[in-house]
C-alpha cells in the first residue's frame, strides 16, 4: 500500500495481471504456489514488492518460469532485491538452502521515502547484515589470486563497514523521524546496492563465512526466527568472526558501534546462554 502512489504512475500503460501475496515465508511450497498460478504463468514480468523473503520467493519463481523479475524494496534489511540467489527456509522458519539463480533481477527500484516510513528495526537489522559482507568477503578471499570481478567486489565491500559506522547513527535517527536524509540514503544504498554488488561480483566462495553460517545454524532455535531479524543475528556472528580471526581493531570498532545502536554483543542478547553447548546450532552451521 505504501508503494501504491509511486507505483501506479510508474506502470503507465502496463497491464497488471493480478496482485498475489507470496505467502509470508520463503519456502519452496510458496514458490510452487506462484509458479502454478495461471495468472503468474501468463505474466511477462514478475514484480516483487516487499522485503527479503518476499523478493527471494518471487526471484526463484521467476527463475523457474524463465521470466524477468523486477524488485521493489520496501525495507532495507538485506540485499535480496539485487542478488541472484534466494535464501530458502522450511515452513517452521529454519534455514533450508540457497539456490543459485540464472540471473539477477533486471531492475531494482528503491523508494527511499517508503523505506524511511517502514518499521525502523528492519533498517537497524540491515545495518548489521551489511557490515558482515566486508568482514566475510575479505576473510574468505584472503591470500587468493582473485580475478577482476572478485577483486572489484572485494574492493566494493569496504563500503559496507567504515561508511556504515560513519552514517549509521544519523541514518537511524532520520528513519525514526520518518525523514529522508543524506545519511539515510547512504545507508540504504550500502545495504541494498553495495552489498548486493559484492554478492553479484565475487566468486560464490567469497560471499559468506562464519557470520552467516552461525545465523543459519541458529535458525534451528525457534525463538531466533520468531523474535530476531536476519541481520540482527548475523551482526553477532560478525563479532564472533572478527574475534576468531584476531581482527582486534575492527572488532573494537564493530563492538562499540553495536553497543551504540543496540545490535547484539553477547549471547544473552539473542536469548541464549554461555552454558548452552549449541550442538544443534553448530551441526546446522557446518552444512
Show the residue positions of the predicted features.
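Active-site segments that bind and position negatively charged phosphate/pyrophosphate groups
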Residues: 148-257
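ATP/NTP phosphate-donor binding region
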Residues: 1-44, 267
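Solvent-exposed alpha-helices and their adjacent loops that cap or buttress functional pockets
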Residues: 38-41, 62, 97-103, 107-108, ...
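Short glycine/serine/threonine-rich phosphate/pyrophosphate-binding segments
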Residues: 2-4, 28, 53-59, 78-82, ...
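A short, small-residue-rich loop immediately preceding and capping a beta-strand
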Residues: 38-61, 65-76
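C-terminal charged capping/lid subdomain of soluble metabolic enzymes
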Residues: 143, 247-287
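A glycine/threonine-rich phosphate-anchoring loop and its flanking beta-alpha core
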Residues: 65-156
Amino acid at each position: 500500500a505504501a508503494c501504491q502512489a509511486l507505483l501506479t504512475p510508474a506502470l503507465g500503460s502496463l497491464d497488471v495481471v493480478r496482485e498475489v501475496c507470496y505467502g509470508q515465508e520463503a519456502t519452496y511450497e510458496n514458490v510452487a504456489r506462484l509458479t502454478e498460478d495461471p495468472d503468474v504463468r501468463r505474466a511477462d514480468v514478475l514484480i516483487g514488492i516487499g522485503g527479503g523473503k518476499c523478493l527471494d520467493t518471487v526471484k526463484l519463481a521467476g527463475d523457474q518460469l524463465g521470466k524477468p523479475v523486477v524488485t521493489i524494496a520496501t525495507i532495507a534489511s538485506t540485499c535480496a532485491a539485487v542478488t541472484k540467489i534466494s535464501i530458502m527456509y522450511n515452513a517452521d522458519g529454519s534455514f533450508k538452502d540457497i539456490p543459485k539463480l540464472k540471473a539477477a533481477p533486471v531492475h531494482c527500484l528503491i523508494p527511499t521515502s517508503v523505506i524511511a516510513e517502514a518499521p525502523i528495526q528492519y533498517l537497524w537489522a540491515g545495518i548489521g547484515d551489511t557490515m558482515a559482507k566486508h568482514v566475510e568477503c575479505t576473510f574468505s578471499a584472503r591470500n587468493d589470486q582473485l580475478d577482476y570481478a572478485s577483486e572489484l567486489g572485494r574492493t566494493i565491500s569496504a563500503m559496507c563497514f567504515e561508511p556504515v559506522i560513519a552514517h549509521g547513527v544519523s541514518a537511524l535517527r532520520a528513519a525514526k523521524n520518518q525523514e529522508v536524509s543524506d545519511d539515510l540514503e547512504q545507508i540504504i544504498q550500502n545495504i541494498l546496492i553495495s552489498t548486493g554488488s559484492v554478492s553479484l561480483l565475487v566468486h560464490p566462495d567469497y560471499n559468506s563465512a562464519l557470520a552467516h553460517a552461525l545465523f543459519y545454524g541458529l535458525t534451528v532455535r525457534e525463538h531466533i526466527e520468531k523474535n530476531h531479524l536476519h541481520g540482527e543475528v548475523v551482526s553477532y556472528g560478525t563479532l564472533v568472526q572478527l574475534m576468531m580471526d584476531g581482527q582486534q581493531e575492527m572488532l573494537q570498532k564493530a563492538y562499540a558501534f553495536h553497543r551504540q545502536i543496540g545490535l547484539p554483543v553477547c549471547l544473552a542478547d539473542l536469548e541464549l546462554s554461555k552454558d548452552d553447548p549449541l550442538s544443534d546450532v553448530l551441526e546446522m552451521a557446518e552444512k
